[in-house]
């Protein structure tokens, strides 16, 4: 898949991600319906509806490429697939349920087992990010594209984002010391990767334990 094709797909998804974000916020406002999945993690009608919106659009854009989603896949690894979409309709479901502002809506296109395109929407923060190549990563601000490759952190302090569960674990603190981290901030969801891309943070440190849609 050539660069222009990836760009066209990414741009075609932006309005869908905005719509999905609005739906997620509206469903939360009305009151979410919650269940506990077999892996003991929560899922809401917001997760299901956002998943439906994304998979419907993506299936239209690339009907030949299979989709792996947190809300429709088993916990088995999909090691035999070379080309596929990864969807995490709502990353940070606990934040979403508890009216916190860190949940995100996510999709990535994997070609030859490597990510080549991604879109992330943080609806509460009104931040929308997308990328279709290493030097083509953007945030939409006031309907204008900001190329994140040009964004630099304004201070020299090394700042890291950590997940809530890893905050004070000895191996994480050891890495902080090794990298001479000046400050860290607890953060949920894929928002961690977005703020690094935007030049606001430097590192994300976590234990190597994740499903496909968490990476």
Please provide the spans of the model-predicted regions:
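Residues that form or immediately flank small-molecule/cofactor binding pockets and catalytic motifs
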Residues: 29, 39, 72, 142, ...
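Generic detector of well-ordered alpha-helical packing
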Residues: 48, 71, 89-92, 123, ...
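An extended, acidic
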Residues: 150-215
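Residue-level signal for inorganic ion chemistry
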Residues: 24, 47, 58, 93, ...
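DPxDG-like acidic metal-binding loop motif
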Residues: 79-138
């Amino acid at each position: 898949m050539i660069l222009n094709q990836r760009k066209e797909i990414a741009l075609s998804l932006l309005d869908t991600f905005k719509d999905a974000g609005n739906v997620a916020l509206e469903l939360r406002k009305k009151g979410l319906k919650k269940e506990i999945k077999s892996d003991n993690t929560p899922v809401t009608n917001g997760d299901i509806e956002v998943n439906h919106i994304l998979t419907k659009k993506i299936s239209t854009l690339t009907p030949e490429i299979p989709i792996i989603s947190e809300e429709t896949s088993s916990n088995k690894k999909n090691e035999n697939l070379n080309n596929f979409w990864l969807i995490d309709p709502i990353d940070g479901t606990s934040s979403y349920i508890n009216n916190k502002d860190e949940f995100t809506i996510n999709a990535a296109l994997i070609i030859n087992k490597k990510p080549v395109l991604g879109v992330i929407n943080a609806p509460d923060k009104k931040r929308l990010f997308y990328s279709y190549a290493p030097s083509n990563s953007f945030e939409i601000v006031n309907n204008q594209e900001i190329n994140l490759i040009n964004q630099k952190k304004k201070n020299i302090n090394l700042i890291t984002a950590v997940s809530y569960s890893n905050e004070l674990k000895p191996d994480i603190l050891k890495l902080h010391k090794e990298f001479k981290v000046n400050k860290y901030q607890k953060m949920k969801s894929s928002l961690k990767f977005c703020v690094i891309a935007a030049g606001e943070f430097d590192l994300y440190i976590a234990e190597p334990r994740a499903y496909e849609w968490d990476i």
